[in-house]
Regions:
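Active-site microenvironment of metallo-dependent hydrolases
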Residues: 1-118
Length: 118
């Protein structure tokens, strides 16, 4: 159990606060920093990362569908479990874990991604 709001609201906070409200990043810049850029950085240590952070045939199909106009984090230090708003669908490895704003907590399709050591 992580007792910090970043556990539940990190990306939603960036998209809602720093992209939409403050305009610090463009949507494309923020999405790249959350997806393709970390995946590319880790590929040399973990070849499985070459299938992450991308939308293309043969990729892992980790996808989040959200509304840029409403996405926002709600978690706090006191209530770290509060889910973000504006996240409609989530697929992990191509399997639906959130549909129409409802999370299916019985589904756990994630897999460990292992890499070599330096």
């Amino acid at each position: 159990h992580n007792n910090h709001p970043r556990a539940a609201g990190c990306f939603s906070r960036v998209l809602g606060t720093y992209v939409r409200e403050k305009g610090v990043l463009t949507l494309n810049e923020a999405l790249a920093k959350m997806t393709i850029l970390p995946a590319r950085l880790l590929e040399s240590r973990s070849p499985a990362m070459a299938r992450r952070g991308r939308l293309r045939a043969g990729a892992a199909a980790d996808v989040t569908v959200f509304d840029p106009a409403t996405i926002s984090d709600r978690s706090t230090i006191e209530q770290t479990w509060l889910e973000s708003v504006g996240v409609h669908h989530v697929l992990v490895g191509g399997q639906v874990v959130r549909s129409a704003g409802v999370t299916d907590r019985s589904v756990r399709p994630g897999v460990p991604i292992l890499g070599g050591v330096a």
